[in-house]
Structures are given as C-alpha cells and as structure tokens.
C-alpha cells in the first residue's frame, strides 16, 4: 500500500488544515446602514480566536435581548464609549457612516463592498484606508496596499484604524512560541522541504545528499502522490 505524502494530506483537509471555526465568537458586521441609525455602548472588550484584533461586546440601544452582540472596534475605543452606525453618526473615532458623509483625507476601516453586506475590506489588526476623492456616486479609497479602489457612496465604513496595531512588532524569539501561534490557525508548521525528507515521504526525498534526484517538472495529470515540484511548467531555469 502506498504512503500518503503531506501534499495529499493537505488536499484531504483533515483537522490540521481546517480553520477552528467552532471557536469563533461571532461574525462581525455593521449594525446600521446608510438609511438606518443604530446606537450601542461598549460594555467589554474580548479576544476572538477568529482574528488577531480585539472585539467589543456592545449593548444595542432599544434592544432587550440578552444575547451578546459583538463589533469590530478601532484603536482608542474603550469601555463605556458610545458607537453609532448610520447616517446620523458624527465623524469621530469608532463611528460608522456612509462613505459619502466622510470627508476626504479621513482614515477608515471595515468598508462594505456593497451597501448592506456588513463590511468586507480593511479589517485586519492595525490597518487603515484613506478617503481620496468623490465622483458621481462613487468614493475613492486608498487601500492599505496603496492601490485606489472605488466604492458605492452608500457603503458604510468605520472611522479610524483597526485595533491591535503593532502586534507583529514583538519578536517571537522561540520556536515554541511560534508553534503555539500557528496551532491557532489552519496552518501546518513547520514546513519541511521535500529534499530533507525520507524517500518514502516525498518524491524528492532520500539520497546521500539533499537533491531532487529527478526532473522537478511534472505533468498536469500526474497522480496525486507524484504531483510535486514544477507542475505543468512552461519553462524552467533562469531567463536569459
């Protein structure tokens, strides 16, 4: 019976490669819209295994439910602060309002791709986008990558930058720290090179020294255990 290599295990998608979504606390979306204003008060700040940024537990004004409501927050938002979503919100840190109501040059985050979808862009810890212009029902935003992107003016966005900035500034220092960090995500770590494996574990494994021992190019229709290296490569080597 053949030996299943790590590439095939990843394709099967076992627990090691699946995101721990059963631990996620909530799907964070805007509570209001371009036509409806919602107010809430931050009552606590918690950690969510789904992301690297802290999230806020909020109490929606006029809502009697005891169910916890969560919101994505910006840097500087604290317990007891009022957050507002909708057209009546003012342009202050933490509030969410239509892009048409946000002045040019203001930093924003958690931008909707389409009005009412709850927020899709600029949601990672410490990131921000900047309003750069408005034209014919569209609002231009400079994304964290530096590229401009145009959105419908009715899309909601949160004023400020996402909380949790500076997270990657602290060095890992120890492999054990990195191990536990990677265990929280759908990533297998460390990633071992094929030439460093035994011959049974990878087509490039084994031998007296580390080398593939065969051409790295492989056909598109190769069997799963062989399909490693340069798959269906048009060319290999350095360009001249």
UniProtKB/Swiss-Prot annotation:
Region described as Disordered: spans on this chain: 1-20, 204-240
GO molecular function, a single term: structural constituent of ribosome
Gene3D superfamilies xref list: 2.30.30.30, Nucleic acid-binding proteins, Ribosomal protein L2, domain 3
The keyword Ribonucleoprotein is annotated on this UniProt entry: yes
A GO CC annotation given for this chain: cytosolic large ribosomal subunit
Keyword S-adenosyl-L-methionine in record: no
GO BP annotation list: cytoplasmic translation
Keywords (A to Z) from UniProt: Ribonucleoprotein, Ribosomal protein, RNA-binding, rRNA-binding
Compositional bias of kind Polar residues: 1-10
Domain of life: Archaea
Similarity-based family: Belongs to the universal ribosomal protein uL2 family.
Subunit and partners: Part of the 50S ribosomal subunit. Forms a bridge to the 30S subunit in the 70S ribosome.
Function: One of the primary rRNA binding proteins. Required for association of the 30S and 50S subunits to form the 70S ribosome, for tRNA binding and peptide bond formation. It has been suggested to have peptidyltransferase activity; this is somewhat controversial. Makes several contacts with the 16S rRNA in the 70S ribosome.
Protein name (record): Large ribosomal subunit protein uL2
Species of provenance: Methanocorpusculum labreanum (strain ATCC 43576 / DSM 4855 / Z)
Chain's gene name: rpl2
């Amino acid at each position: 019976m053949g030996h299943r290599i790590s590439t095939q295990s990843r394709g099967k998608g076992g627990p090691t490669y699946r995101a721990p979504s059963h631990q996620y606390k909530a799907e964070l979306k805007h509570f209001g819209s371009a036509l409806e204003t919602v107010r809430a008060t931050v009552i606590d700040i918690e950690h969510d295994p789904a992301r690297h940024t802290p999230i806020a537990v909020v109490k929606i004004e006029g809502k009697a439910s005891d169910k916890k409501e969560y919101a994505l927050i910006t840097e500087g938002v604290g317990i007891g602060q009022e957050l507002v979503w909708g057209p009546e919100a003012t342009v202050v840190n933490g509030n969410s309002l239509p892009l048409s109501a946000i002045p040019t040059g203001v930093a924003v985050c958690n931008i909707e791709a389409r009005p009412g979808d709850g927020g899709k862009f600029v949601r990672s810890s410490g990131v921000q986008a900047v309003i750069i212009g408005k034209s014919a029902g569209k609002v231009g935003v400079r994304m964290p990558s530096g590229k401009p992107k145009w959105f419908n003016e009715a899309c909601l966005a949160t004023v400020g930058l996402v909380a949790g900035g500076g997270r990657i500034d602290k060095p890992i220092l120890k492999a054990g720290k990195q191990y536990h960090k990677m265990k929280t995500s759908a990533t297998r770590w460390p990633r071992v090179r094929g030439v460093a494996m035994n011959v049974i574990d990878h087509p490039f494994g084994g031998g007296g020294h580390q080398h593939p021992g065969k051409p790295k190019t492989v056909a598109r229709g190769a069997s799963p255990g062989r399909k490693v290296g340069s798959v269906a490569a048009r060319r290999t080597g350095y360009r001249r």
